[in-house]
UniProtKB/Swiss-Prot annotation:
Job description of the protein: Required for the export of heme to the periplasm for the biogenesis of c-type cytochromes.
Keyword Cell inner membrane: yes
Biological process according to GO: cytochrome c biosynthetic process; cytochrome complex assembly
Domain of life: Bacteria
The entry's keywords: Cell inner membrane, Cell membrane, Cytochrome c-type biogenesis, Membrane, Transmembrane, Transmembrane helix, Transport
Membrane topology term: Multi-pass membrane protein
The organism of origin for this protein: Bradyrhizobium diazoefficiens (strain JCM 10833 / BCRC 13528 / IAM 13628 / NBRC 14792 / USDA 110)
MF (Gene Ontology): heme transmembrane transporter activity
Protein name: Heme exporter protein B
Gene this protein is translated from: cycW
Keyword check for Transport: yes
Family annotation (Pfam families): CcmB
Family statement: Belongs to the CcmB/CycW/HelB family.
Length: 222
């Protein structure tokens, strides 16, 4: 347990450094959301309807932007080999690294959502709903993206391959995240059904992601 907590703290410190990746994802998310009102124009009703989709799409793209560094930096400096050979099960190490990535790169997006919701003409209830769906759904983006990052870690131009692998897995999360948010804003669909599916997707990814990523790393590093 001590080794896993040390790994989480280490990855968070690395991610929060300049060039570590977390800041890049947050700045990209802010840029996407801030520019969208200028692209949509003065129609505030349209902007509020598109608001949840804009926030979710920004979060998805920001997540993809930072996931390629999840294992790449460790592979480059040799620490990934040490993690693989340590007594700690590789599946738990992968889960710890994904959790650290979410805390450093995913959680700040959720914290920024209430402020950015004002730019998209969302009221407090709608903004809270979007933040809640991001809290429930962004772990799925991280843990499914971890599989693609593990597959691409030993490949040339692996970032492009990771995006191709991860995007299809992320589409259901995007669909149900936006659907749950839209249910609060426009109805008449119930918020509970898509939100429950979104939570289920995150739970499934929490279980499958570490095992699939560990298997990919073992195969790629052999």
């Amino acid at each position: 347990m001590t080794a896993l907590s040390a790994l989480i703290r280490r990855d968070i410190r690395i991610a929060l450094r300049v060039g570590g990746g977390a800041l890049i994802g947050v700045l990209f998310f802010l840029t996407v959301v801030v520019l969208m009102p200028f692209a949509v124009g003065p129609d505030l009703a349209l902007l509020s309807r598109l608001g949840p989709a804009i926030l979710w799409l920004g979060a998805l793209l920001a997540s993809l932007l930072t996931l390629d560094r999840l294992f790449m930096a460790d592979h480059e400096d040799g620490s990934l080999d040490l993690i693989t050979m340590s007594r700690t099960p590789l599946e738990l190490a992968c889960a710890a690294k994904a959790l650290a990535h979410w805390l450093a790169a995913g959680l700040p997006l959720i914290v920024a959502t209430p402020v950015l919701g004002l730019l998209l003409n969302l009221d407090m209830v709608a903004t809270g709903a979007v933040a809640l769906t991001l809290l429930a759904g962004t772990p799925a983006l991280t843990f499914t993206g971890m599989i693609g990052a593990a597959l691409a870690v030993t490949l040339h131009r692996g970032g492009l391959l990771m995006a191709v692998l991860v995007l299809p897995l992320s589409i259901p999360v995007l669909i149900f995240g936006v659907a749950a948010s839209q249910a609060v804003i426009v109805g008449p669909m119930s918020f509970g059904a898509p939100f429950s599916i979104l939570c289920a997707l995150s739970l499934v990814s929490l279980v499958i992601g570490p095992f699939a990523a560990a298997a990919s790393l073992r195969h790629g590093l052999d």
